[in-house]
Amino acid sequence: MPSLNDVRSTFLNYFERNGHRVVESSPLVPRNDPTLMFTNSGMVQFKNLFTGVETRDYKRATTAQKCVRAGGKHNDLDNVGYTARHHTFFEMLGNFSFGDYFKDGAIPFAWELLTKDFGIPKDKLLVTVYHTDDEAADIWKKVAGLSDDRIIRIPTSDNFWQMGPTGPCGPCTEIFYDHGEQIWGGPPGSADEDGDRFIEIWNLVFMQNEQFEDGTMRALDMQSIDTGMGLERIGALLQGKHDNYDTDLMRGLIEASAHATSADPDGPGKVHHRVIADHLRSTSFLIADGVMPSNEGRGYVLRRIMRRAMRHAHMLGAKDPVMHRLVPALVREMGAAYPELGRAQALIEETLKLEETRFKQTLDRGLRLLDDELAKLPEGANLPGEAAFKLYDTYGFPLDLTQDALREKGRAVDTAGFDSAMAEQKAKARAAWAGSGETKDAAIWFDIAEEHGATEFLGYDTEISEGQVLALVQDGAAVEEAGEGQQVQIVVNQTPFYGEAGGQVGDTGLIKTETGAARVTDTKKTGGVFIHIAEVTLGTIQRGQGAQLSVDHDRRSAIRANHSATHLLHEALRRALGEHVAQRGSLNAPDRLRFDFSHAKAMTPEELAQVEREVNDFIRQNSPVETRIMTPDDARALGAQALFGEKYGDEVRVVSMGELPGSGKGTGGQTYSLELCGGTHVARTGDIGMFALTSETASAAGIRRIEALTGQAAMDELRRVDGELNEIAGIVKAQAGDVVSKVRALADERKALANEVAQLKRQLAMGGGSEDKPREINGIKLIARRVEGVSGKELGPLVDEMKSRLGSGAVVVLAEADGKATVAAGVTPDLTGRISAVELVQTATAALGGKGGGGRPDRAQGGAPSLAAADSAISAVETLIGEKA
C-alpha cells in the first residue's frame, strides 16, 4: 500500500520522466495575484505563463502545490472534520503545458499514470467532457477504449473552465472513480451525482480560447494544459480507503492528537481529532509561509482556523495547550517534502502555544456564555443573531466557531440577525479585499512593457548613465512631452536608478535631455519597468530623446550602508534568537533602517546588546561585500537566506559579507551573512561606519521591529545621547559614570519627600494637628472646610482620617490644586441611613457651578469649575443636613 509521500513521488517522477520540469510549490500567499487570499490551486503560480505575460525556460511543468481553502470564494472550513473529503489544507498534484502538448498529450499521460503506475483497474474509471468537445471524447475512445456510456457529456460550467470574466478559458475533462454499487450515488450529470459512489479524482483543463468583455471568444495562439488532482483523494483511493482521514498521513496526525489529549482516536471524539489533524496542517504551513495570527486579512483567517482547532482540543478535555505539541509529528510526516516546515518548526510551535494560551480563557468564558444563552431558549431553538454577535464582539468568537459549537448540540444561529449586527465590519472587510482600483494605471504600464520590454538596470555598477526616453506618462495616459513645472513619470531603456523593492527605497536624482531637465523624486518598478517619478524643472522632456541620468550619490551611499547593515542585523538576530528568525519586512532609507522579523516576544536588553555588538564587530572587520549570480537552487544549497514573499527568476543575486573566525581566504571558513538580494550594497562592511540600535518594538502579532542608524547618523545619535548624559551629570553634580546611581538616589529622595509633603498637607488641612471643632446640626456633627494645595487624589485619605477623628458625623472638604477644584465628602457608618456622602457632594458641586459627583454612601467625590463660591457650598451642605430628620 503506497503512502501519501509515495503517491506524491510517483506522480512527480512520472511527469519528470516525460519531460516535465519539477517546480517546487509556491507559497500559500500568492506572489502574482492580489485577488486571492491564499494559493488554492496548482495553476496560480503559472498564471502569467498561461496569459503570455511571462516566459520561462521550460514548457512542461509538474508540481505538488500546497493549497489552503478557508476564507473568500473557496471556503471549506465549516465542513472540515465532518465529511470524508473536506480540508482547509490539501496538496494539488498537477501537470502543465505552456504551448507544448495539448489534449492528445494530456489525456494519454493521465490514463497511463492512473492505470499503469498507480495500477487502477480500467473498468473503475469513467470520464466527463464538455458537451461540444468531440476532440476530447474521440481521444478518450482511442487512448482508453472507453465506450460512449463511460464518456459523459456535460453541458454546464462544471466542464468549462474560465480564469475570470475575461482571459484564457476552455473545456475540461474530469476523471471519476467508481466505488461500486454498494455505495449510493449516480454518475456525474445524473440526479444522484452528489452521492459518494462516483468520485472525481482528476481534472484536465484545455486552455484553447480567450474570452472578451463583449462575450465573444477566439482561439488562443498558445494552447495550454492545466491539470489538478488532490493528493489526499487519490491517496485514499490507492490505499483502499473511502475517507481521506483514514490515509496514513492523516492517521498519523490523528493518533498524535489522540496521544496528546489521552482520547480515543476512534471514540466519541473522532470528529475533534479530524479537525485538529487538518487544522494543524493549514496553520503550520501558513505560519511557515509568513502569515501570523491577527485581526484582519490572512492573519484573521489563520486565527479562525487555529481557534477552531483549539476549541475541538478543549472538547477532548485538554486543559493545557496541545497544538504546539503536535508539530513534530507533522514535520515527521511532511518535512521531507516541504523543508520549510522544519526550518520554521520553532516559530510554529511558539506561535501556536502563545495563541492557544491566550485563547484558553476566552474560550472558557465564551462557551459558558453560549451555554447561558442556550439555557434561556426553548428546547431546540436557534441562537439569536444578537447573542452570536456578542460572542464575536466581546469574546472574539467568529461566527463559524459559534456555529461549530452549536452544530454538536443540534442548534444553529440566526444568521440574519448576526449579519445585521456585523454589517459595518463586513463592509469594511469587503472594501479591504475589493482591489487597489489601479486598473487604468496597470494597463498603461502593461502596454509600455509590451512595447518596449523591461528596463535594463545599470545601478549595480554605476550611478551615472545615458539612456533613451521611451515613454512619458501623466494621469495614467501616455504623452509626447512634459513641460516645466509638470509632474511626469519617465521610462527609459536603461537606468542607474534603483526602483523601490525588497525594502529598499527608490533612488532620487536628475534626468537631463537636450531640451530640459527633471528632478527625480522617487523610482518605482512594476513588471520589469522602472518608473522615474519626476518634476520637470527646466524646459521640456520629450519622448524619444536621449537622456543623461544621475543618481543622488550621497543619498544612495546612505541607503547602501543601511541595506548592508540589515543583512548583518538579520544574521546577528538569527544567531542570538534562533533559526526561526526570518525577515518579514524592512525599510532601507537614507536616514534610517527598519527591520521586521519573526519572533514572538520582546528582546531582552542583553540580547539587544549582543546583536548590536556583533553587527559592529563585522563592520570593523571591513570584509568585502561580494555578489554572485547563480540559480535559486544553488543559492539555497549554499544556505542563502531568501527574502520572504519575494519572487525569484532563473538567476538570483547572492550577497555575502563577513568572515567567521578562521574563514579568511584559503582557510575554508564560512561566510557570516549570505542572502538572496536584488538591492545595492557597500563595497566593504567598513563602509557602513557604525551601527546603533534605537528601538525594538512589536510590529504585529509574532513580529518584532528593530529600528537603527548607521554611519554619520549613528555617530550623531551617540553624540546626542552622550551630550544629554553629560548635561544630566552636570545637573545632578555627578560624574557621567555615576549618573545612574545618582539619579536613582534622587528618585528615592523625591519619593520620600513627596510622602512627607503629603503628610504635611493632610495635617495642615486638618488644622495643623489641632483638634477639629465640628459644628453640630440636627444632631449630626459636621466638619466642612476649604483647603488649598491638596489634589483630588489626596482627598480620599484625608476625609477618611477626619472621619476617624470625628467618631460620628459628616465631613465635607473643598480643595483646589493645579487649577482643579474637587469636593470630597464622608459619612460615618452609623449615619449613612440618614444622609449620604453622595448627596453632600452633589449639593456642594451644584453650589459651585458643577454637575454630579458620585461614590458610596460613606464616601464620595466630585469636581467643580472653581471654589469661588466655597462659602455658599458649605452653607448649602449645612442646610441639607439641617433638613434631615
UniProtKB/Swiss-Prot annotation:
A Pfam family assignment: tRNA-synt_2c
Residues that, per the record, bind Zn(2+): 563, 567, 677, 681
Cofactor: Zn(2+)
Cofactor detail note: Binds 1 zinc ion per subunit.
Superkingdom of the organism of origin: Bacteria
Keyword Hydrolase: no
EC number: 6.1.1.7
Locations listed in the record: Cytoplasm
InterPro entries (UniProt xref): aa-tRNA-synth_II/BPL/LPL, Ala-tRNA-lgiase_IIc, Ala-tRNA-ligase_IIc_anticod-bd, Ala-tRNA-synth_IIc_core, Ala-tRNA-synth_IIc_N, Ala-tRNA_ligase, Ala_tRNA_ligase_euk/bac, DHHA1_dom
Protein name according to UniProt: Alanine--tRNA ligase
Upper taxonomic lineage: Bacteria, Pseudomonadati, Pseudomonadota, Alphaproteobacteria, Rhodobacterales
